[in-house]
Design a protein with these regions (language model features):
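Conserved, mostly hydrophobic/aromatic
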Residues: 59, 71, 111, 126, ...
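Structural preference for beta-strand elements that scaffold enzyme active sites
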Residues: 66-70, 110, 137-141, 172-175, ...
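Structural motif corresponding to the early beta-alpha repeats
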Residues: 133-154, 179-182
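CE4/NodB-like, metal-dependent polysaccharide N-deacetylase domain
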Residues: 156-176, 205-209
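Beta/alpha (TIM)-barrel catalytic core signal, keyed to glycine-rich beta->alpha loops juxtaposed to Asp/Glu
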Residues: 181-391, 395-414, 443, 453
Length: 469
């Protein structure tokens, strides 16, 4: 494995810059085909949301013309106004319908869901919203999310797949993924979930029968599984692969977490095989839209009218071979901002790419915890709100409110911001001091965070702050 790491053919900086140039030409051409009209100079304008300027990419194996912006149905709105991933509130179906209608009216045609999303209710909500539109107006992507050992049998996995068809109200699935390969115990778990039970063979047969139009996988964790599946591409003929990619993970994913793999390598391997890439976590779980103030100022100085988040979406969308970039859009303003970015796309220039790489290097000086707020660690058997604790710490770190000493110039202000904000963000009975170290959370974390260790560290730090350090 060490030799393999040394020999990995990642893109050189020069190759990437050539790639960016090619992507710009391709994006411009596809946009012109999609809508015509002006050059898209007003894409960043808060006043305009073009309805006919979406950028599209064509899947080379199926010919599907897919919107560069994909709607991730993981963070659907709840009746209480929050994401339905949080708490026990019901999905706001009326708002989901409104978001889907608006997205389709503005050129979005790729909708990504899973049996695991929104406490098992995302597929049904997605099916209700999309079934109100002609079937040829959208592509549905869902996953075989057989994470629990109880679902590893052939019968249970087939039942999950059949239920997806029922919940989505369709007789075929446009894009079906093996969900989260590389997680857990890596190769051993992959074999148990998909190979030993014959499920991968079953899915290949479903593709031949036309009930699955495109078959792929989403990857987290053990890169040996990723490499294994690509090495057998001639046999499996993957139609697409979903990877985590953003301007921070491009070169720093492994430094952030040794379990992860730099997006530059993942993307490069797909490009070598001409496999379309579907991008998840373009904002790194929101971290790239909630950056430190110094980074906000840096981005705004370069492009005052563009949102902070749009930089991350432009980075992912500017790469050739990227079929669609997923965004979980809970509110209409999220959808509208992303539409301004991709309708049409203003591809990165070579200078933009260098600028973002320098920005990423600056961000790496902040020692944040790589939590993406995916909530796979929840629920905690002891009631902790794990993501809220980790995200509060990151927020304070980004804002300069994690003092190291009582002698720090802003100690009193930072101490108050951390402790008062902690109590406001996380109820006392759900804070880090309740962690007993059972470790039931860590095994579910796609980022492989040692969650008990981080919780104990944050709790110890909060106690030191209370004592005046």
């Amino acid at each position: 494995m060490n030799d393999q790491n040394k020999n990995r053919n990642v893109l050189s900086r020069r190759e990437f810059l050539k790639t960016i140039g090619a992507a710009g030409m391709a994006a411009t051409g596809l946009t012109a085909c999609a809508g015509g009209g002006n050059d898209g100079a007003s894409a960043a304008s808060a006043a305009e949301i073009p309805a006919d300027r979406m950028t599209y990419r064509t899947n080379p194996t199926s010919g599907d013309k897919v919107s560069l912006l994909g709607f991730g149905m993981m963070r659907l709105p709840s009746v209480g106004g929050r994401s339905a991933r949080e708490g026990n509130e019901e999905i706001d179906q009326e708002m989901v319908n409104e978001l889907v209608d608006y997205a389709i009216a503005h050129g979005v045609n790729y909708f990504d869901t899973s049996p695991a999303y929104c406490r098992g209710k995302s597929e049904r909500a997605t099916g209700i919203a999309l079934s109100r539109h002609p079937r040829d107006k959208y592509f549905i992507a869902t996953k075989l999310s057989n994470f629990a050992p109880a679902t590893w049998s052939r019968e249970a996995s087939v039942a999950m797949y059949r239920n997806s068809l029922k919940e989505l109200q369709v007789d075929y699935i446009d894009y079906l993924l093996l969900h989260g390969v590389g997680m857990g115990s890596g190769m051993e778990e992959f074999e148990s979930r998909y190979v030993k039970n014959g499920i991968l063979d079953f899915l290949l047969e479903e593709r031949r029968a036309g009930r699955i139009r495109n078959l792929g996988f989403s990857y987290h964790g053990d890169v040996r599984v990723f490499d294994h599946l690509l090495a057998r591409h001639d046999e499996y003929k993957w139609n697409f692969v979903q990877i985590q990619l953003n301007y921070l993970d491009w070169k720093y994913a492994k430094r952030i977490n040794p379990r992860n793999t730099d997006a530059e390598y993942l993307y490069g391997e797909l490009r070598k095989r001409n496999i379309p890439a579907v991008i998840m976590e373009p904002l790194l779980g929101g971290r790239l839209s909630n950056v430190p103030g110094t980074i906000v100022a840096r981005l705004k100085q370069r492009e005052p009218e563009m949102s902070v988040a749009s930089w991350a979406f432009r980075f992912a969308g500017s790469l050739p071979g990227v079929q669609t970039v997923l965004s979980g859009m809970t509110r209409m303003e999220h959808l509208q901002d992303n539409l301004r970015t991709y309708a049409p796309l203003k591809p990165l220039t070579e200078d933009d790419f260098r600028f973002l790489q320098e920005t990423a290097a600056q961000m790496m000086r902040f020692d944040t915890i790589p939590c993406n707020d995916c909530k796979y660690c929840m629920p905690c058997p002891y009631g902790l709100d794990i993501p809220a604790i980790l995200l509060h710490y990151n927020k304070c770190l980004n804002e300069g409110n994690v003092p190291e000493s009582s002698q720090d110039a802003n100690f009193r202000k930072a101490r108050q911001a951390f402790l008062v904000g902690y109590d406001r963000s996380v109820p006392k009975l759900r804070q880090a001091n309740r962690c007993i170290g059972c470790n039931q959370c860590s095994v579910h974390c796609p980022q492989r965070i040692d969650i008990p260790k981080e919780l104990h560290r944050i709790d110890a730090y909060a106690e030191r702050l209370k004592q005046g350090i």
